[in-house]
């Protein structure tokens, strides 16, 4: 399956099973520098923040499980929650490809917050 079709299928699967505001592809595939054995690095911005820590940590794993099972890509897909990874990885993610955007203010607020954190912590330090 071609890269574009795989991405479209991933987006469709995520939207059919989870409530998300944005989906990102990052890493080597987002930069067009993938190798045949490169994994798919995907980040999701869930629509609702999960207050329960256990459930919050499990959510990206559940997305990963659906993608791996439905696409038959076991150990080839890695999914993270944009809001709970470290700021440097957050910046890497939003500098990748946003492959889905629900066009709600939440997406821009989170992205601007990430940029502000990076500027504060790394640029103007």
Please state what every model-predicted region is.
Residues 38-40:
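Short, conserved active-site loops that position catalytic residues or coordinate cofactors/metal ions
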Residues 28:
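Conserved H-loop
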Residues 1-22, 31-36, 49-125:
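Catalytic core of pol beta-like nucleotidyltransferases
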Residues 43-47:
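Short hydrophobic/aromatic beta-strand micro-patches
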